[in-house]
């Protein structure tokens, strides 16, 4: 079996395992625990998220042995790390924390633990079959596993593959893993839907007839979504700082009380627990006939505050769906202002907000098409998402992204010339170009090319400390 075929087989195995793991998490946490929480009496339901973040801290502290609540960021950190694998020791504690946070109503998404489970399983498969994976492919199954996690939880295989490949960089992609990611996403999706069926996450009926005003509206929607995503990203980063630097009992108590107050206030205003859970209930509420502009804007703020408090308390979950929900609610507010009922603005608002927040415009557009089942929204979503990217700039909800892939030649050229030294000949040619020890490899390489000399002599005062040759420079790439 050739190397590419081995990789694809392992990607398919990874996808099946991830599909099973995500299905188990969804059943236990999403279908049992969260539904039980939402059926509690109003007072107990308001307190549930506070209990959830407290249990999350216990899980991370004692089961995870001091692990952090990071989930999707663990995938990014592993991808950019030296060995390209997720450490498996904290996995039980992180999953306990995610289950407690999400199952008891924390305002975060199920894709966080799904991505983490996928990346961890991909790392496990790679370690289990080291003889089948060479150094060039050490991150491939990591990406494939993350793709499988997203594909399963959202029933969106294309989104899973694109997101996992796109999210490591703001202006680049993990393109080497694209085909294995597709295979793993397909295998995971097929496994997951065997248990939970084929229905879409946000089904929408009909397609709007697009006119010039809708396309102009998409420009405005992208601007608003970009500004909103910048504000939301700032809130997320501030919440993560609080979670990282505040004493656990203080943050859990303060944020838990805040979550209880938000939940109680939301119930009084909306007669529904719209601040709890990932936000699917909030999306459904925006499609009711009783919506008003003021209540929609208030809900936009309520969901943002609930998510921020959950993160600040140290809860474990995802940001993907909260971004989508914020964009959907913002788009609904615009739809009310322009007196439309096509759901065009909620859909493209969700795409633009999500794409800007995570710096994944392609994945956001694909997700909207898959989750709603309406590819006719893609053109205005493209426009809105493009504008949102421009407004977002270099901001992101995660600090674990890199802007772009580091060029190995640029990295090599930035190294000190001492790293490329070879022993000098005896004698050194008097015609050899001269460098000093404070030069970089790039400067020495340029001098070699321009002079066509066999080597550059590195001189410290009156002493030749070594030479730089083409071979000694290329040896740095090994």
Annotate each language-model stretch with its function.
Residues 1-431, 436-438, 450-456, 460-461, ...:
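Alpha-helical transmembrane segments and immediately membrane-proximal extracytoplasmic
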Residues 443-450:
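Amphipathic alpha-helical regulatory segments at dimerization interfaces
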């Amino acid at each position: 079996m050739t190397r590419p075929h081995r990789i694809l087989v392992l990607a398919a195995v990874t996808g099946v395992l991830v599909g099973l793991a995500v299905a188990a998490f969804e059943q236990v946490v999403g279908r049992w625990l969260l539904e039980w929480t939402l059926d509690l009496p109003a007072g107990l339901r308001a307190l549930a998220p506070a209990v959830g973040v407290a249990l999350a801290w216990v899980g991370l502290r004692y089961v995870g042995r001091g692990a952090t609540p990071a989930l999707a960021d663990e995938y990014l950190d592993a991808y950019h790390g030296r060995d390209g694998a997720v450490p498996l020791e904290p996995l039980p504690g992180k999953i306990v924390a995610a289950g407690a946070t999400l199952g008891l109503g924390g305002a975060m998404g199920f894709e966080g633990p799904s991505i983490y489970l996928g990346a961890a399983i991909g790392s496990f498969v790679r370690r289990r079959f080291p003889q089948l994976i060479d150094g060039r492919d050490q991150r491939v199954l990591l990406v494939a596993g993350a793709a499988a996690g997203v594909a399963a939880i959202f029933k969106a295989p294309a989104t899973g593959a694109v997101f996992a490949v796109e999210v490591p960089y703001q202006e680049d992609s993990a393109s080497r893993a694209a085909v294995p990611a597709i295979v793993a996403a397909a295998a995971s999706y097929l496994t997951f839907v065997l248990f939970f069926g084929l229905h879409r996450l946000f089904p929408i009926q009909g397609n709007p007839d697009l006119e010039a005003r809708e396309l102009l509206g998409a420009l405005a929607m992208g601007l608003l979504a970009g500004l909103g995503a910048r504000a939301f990203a700032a809130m997320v980063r501030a919440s993560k700082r609080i979670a990282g630097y505040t004493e656990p009992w203080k943050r859990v108590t303060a944020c838990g009380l805040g979550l209880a107050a938000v939940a109680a206030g939301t119930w009084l205003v909306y007669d529904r627990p719209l601040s709890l859970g990932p936000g699917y209930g909030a999306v459904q509420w925006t499609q009711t006939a009783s919506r008003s502009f003021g209540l929609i804007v208030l809900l936009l703020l309520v969901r943002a505050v609930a998510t921020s408090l959950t993160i600040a308390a140290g809860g474990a979950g995802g940001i993907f769906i909260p971004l989508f929900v914020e964009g959907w609610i913002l788009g609904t507010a615009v739809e009310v202002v322009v007196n439309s009922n096509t759901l065009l603005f909620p859909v493209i608002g969700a795409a633009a907000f999500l794409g800007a927040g995570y710096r994944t415009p392609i994945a956001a557009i694909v997700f909207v098409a898959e989750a709603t089942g309406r590819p006719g929204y893609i053109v205005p979503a493209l426009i809105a998402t493009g504008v949102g990217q421009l407004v977002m700039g270099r901001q992101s909800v995660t600090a674990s992204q890199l802007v772009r892939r580091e060029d190995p030649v640029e990295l090599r050229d930035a190294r000190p010339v001492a790293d490329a030294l070879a022993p000098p000949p005896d004698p050194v040619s008097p015609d050899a170009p001269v460098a000093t020890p404070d030069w970089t490899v790039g400067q020495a390489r340029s001098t070699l090319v321009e002079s066509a000399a066999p080597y550059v002599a590195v001189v410290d005062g009156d002493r030749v400390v070594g030479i730089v040759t083409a071979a000694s420079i290329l040896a740095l790439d090994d």
